[in-house]
Curated annotation (Swiss-Prot):
Organism of provenance: Arabidopsis thaliana
Source taxonomy: Eukaryota, Viridiplantae, Streptophyta, Embryophyta, Tracheophyta
Pathway(s) this gene product operates in, as recorded in its UniProt entry: Protein modification; protein ubiquitination
Key words of the record: Auxin signaling pathway, Lipoprotein, Myristate, Nucleus, Ubl conjugation, Ubl conjugation pathway
Protein name: F-box protein SKP2A
Primary location: nucleus
Length: 360
């Protein structure tokens, strides 16, 4: 593997330090832990796993030094691999187990919960075989979870989601896209009651949720920044009004195919932008973002909307763009909204008109 300049410099510094301290390496097992971990940070996870079997010294060093592991490359026998690895890698904070085909079962997730108590980020997307047992285990074994991806997991219930939120109250990012059975108004009420640090929530294609569930979220998760409601066909303007009123830091909202959304929802968003600009839209970390407020809005297939209402949203949030290459206001399938334009296009048009043209 080719090393970058910074990584190569760090290794050189380690070797120089060893030279100054008179440390000699006669066998691989003699490599200092600090140097071993720096070397392993430069190779892929397959080689890290191989290295953990070289000798007991390496195994112990990796066991207590490895904090990130990705096994999404494993196309076969991931369940067995997880069962064999997690008892050794007890200091993991980030674990990616994304699958192209269902492999993971409840016993593997239970092993993770039993051994990896410091876990903060876990990707279990497309784990079609895991059930409520897995979520109950995570609730008790991994209370420090801040990021959890369960997208495409279809075999657990809303009761298990509610139970998980009672114990994993630090969750900030939760992906439940396609979890139709598990995502109900009761599940959203539990998230709103227990996870007030939530910042990003994907509920795409969870078609059973209604305004009651979304309003519970809005009231309970005021720090929400990103919310995907694409394909949530039952929600109406009431959901968007609640989000506009309570989630003043909202930056990205997906409403694709929410055909019950009307102009009232758009005007509530526009009004929230005007109302919150003086104080709360200002970014705390100046320089990272010019201002807060909506930067991404998907209203594709929301065919009840009119140009004036959508233009009002666009005018309230200058970070929404319709111009080529910067599309952050997505309106596919809304043929009546072709006249809606962002500030960039209007400014370019004015600049063009201001330039004197030679007489013909």
């Amino acid at each position: 593997m080719v090393m970058g300049g910074e990584a190569s410099m760090e290794l050189d510094q380690c070797f120089q330090k060893m030279k100054m301290e008179g440390i000699s390496i006669k066998e691989w097992k003699d490599i200092p832990v600090e140097l071993l971990m720096r070397i392993l940070s430069l190779v892929d996870d397959r080689n890290v796993i191989v290295a953990s079997g070289v000798c007991t010294g390496w195994r112990d060093a990796i066991s207590f030094g490895l904090t990130r592991l990705r096994l999404s490359w494993c196309n076969n026998n991931m369940n067995s691999l997880v069962l064999s690895l997690v008892p050794k890698f007890v200091k993991l904070q980030t674990l990616n187990l994304r699958q192209d085909k269902p492999q993971l079962e409840d016993n593997a997730v239970e092993a993770i919960a039993n051994h990896c108590h410091e876990l903060q980020e876990l990707d279990l997307s497309k784990s079609l075989k895991i059930t409520d047992r897995s979520l109950y285990a995570l609730a008790h074994g991994c209370p420090d979870l801040t990021k959890l991806n369960l997208s495409g997991c279809t075999s657990f219930s809303d009761t298990a989601i509610a139970y998980l939120t009672r114990f994993c109250r630090k969750l900030k990012v939760l992906n439940l896209c396609g979890c139709v059975k598990a995502v109900t108004d009761n599940a959203l009420e539990a998230i709103g009651n227990n996870c007030n640090q939530m910042q990003s929530l994907n509920l795409g294609w969870c078609e059973n949720i209604s305004d009651d569930g979304v309003m519970s979220l809005a009231y309970g998760c005021p720090d929400l920044r990103t919310l995907d409601l694409c394909g949530c066909v039952l929600i109406t303007d009431e959901s968007v009004v609640a989000l506009a009123d309570w989630c003043v830091h909202l930056r990205s909202l997906g409403l694709y195919y929410c055909r019950n959304i009307t102009d009232r929802a758009m005007y509530s968003l526009a009004q929230s932008g005007v109302k919150n600009k003086p104080g709360s839209w200002k970014s705390v970390k100046k320089g990272k973002y010019d201002e807060e407020g909506l930067r991404s809005l998907n209203i594709s297939q929301c065919t009840a909307l009119t140009p004036s209402a959508v233009q009002a949203v666009c005018d309230s949030f200058p970070a929404l763009h319709t111009c080529s290459g910067r599309h952050s206001l997505v309106m596919s399938g809304c043929l009546n909204l072709t006249t809606v334009h962002c500030a960039c296009i209007l400014q370019a048009h004015r600049a063009h008109n201001a330039v004197p043209h030679p007489a013909h």
